[in-house]
């Protein structure tokens, strides 16, 4: 089980990316999915947070192929974009 400090660190890093668009995409993805992640998924997400926002957004939109180490269920879930909250 992850420590509270580890989850808070991931939450902060997911929601403070540098642009509002990346904050919504990456932060929204974290909020919607982190509760179901095991240790491997948390480590993969933490590694993904080291990547450039423009790359993560391109993977989510399907305009660029992610590195092989990120391919799989997490990227497929990222591509769904159903976790982004849009203000009305």
Residue ranges and their predicted role:
Residues 2-88:
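Positively charged, polar, low-complexity stretches
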């Amino acid at each position: 089980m992850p420590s509270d400090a580890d989850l808070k660190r991931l939450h902060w890093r997911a929601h403070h990316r540098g642009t509002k668009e990346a904050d919504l995409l990456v932060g929204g993805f974290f909020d919607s999915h982190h509760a179901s992640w095991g240790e491997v998924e948390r480590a993969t997400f933490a590694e993904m947070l080291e990547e450039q926002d423009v790359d993560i957004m391109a993977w989510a939109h399907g305009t660029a192929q992610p590195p092989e180490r990120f391919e799989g269920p997490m990227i497929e879930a990222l591509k769904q974009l159903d976790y982004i909250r849009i203000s009305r």
